Amino acid sequence: MNDREHYQACFDLMQAVAAYRHEPIHRRLEKFGKRESMVHLDVLVLTYHLARICRGSILEIGAFRGGTTVAAAWGVRDAREAKKLITIEPGGSLRKHRLATRNILRSLKRNLARKGVTERVTIVEGRSFEPEVVAAVHRALDADQVGLLILDADADCKRDIDRYGPKLIDGCWLIIDDYGGKADNPKVSPTKTQVDELVNSGLLLPLGYYGFGTWVGRWQGITLPRVR
């Protein structure tokens, strides 16, 4: 991709996200996001859009209460072809926050049920790097490959890309949260460092920066050896 094509790809993506402001889905995402999501509305719209248009399955690492999970599920619902949506979430609790919950997994499952997307989502409980979780994801995907990877867990996005990279299709979309943001967010510095290293190595192509600090881009199609 030359510079002009790269610029056009960035512009087309921004234009696509902006166009949803005139669609009913924008209001639905806005209403749901205010109650259940930490990410910016534009990121929810972006997630919906990419889930709707991508080739292949969708893998989300770090669902929390299901803000982006529901956005992706609605995108899958409105897509022309059937797609798998797999989300990894270890659970636990979060206190002293506007989205505080005593039981993250319970809140996630409740939100999926309330929005009518439970049957569209496969939840894998655990941490993305645990061998049994990696194995469960591969079983759920079977022969399918991933066309959209959403990373919003801890700050080690490179570790997750190393583990799941062999399942990414050439040109797979990536949404990586905490690339930027407030100075007191401990996830920002390591996330930005790792993403920039992957961009400089040619593995990732940057296509934008959305919301409060979410990076979006594409996988460059270099197959990594499978991590066992």
Ranges and model annotations:
Residues 38-43:
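N-terminal pre-P-loop "Q-motif" helix
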Residues 1-37:
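Rossmann-like AdoMet
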Residues 22, 26-33, 45-228:
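S-adenosylmethionine/decaboxylated-SAM
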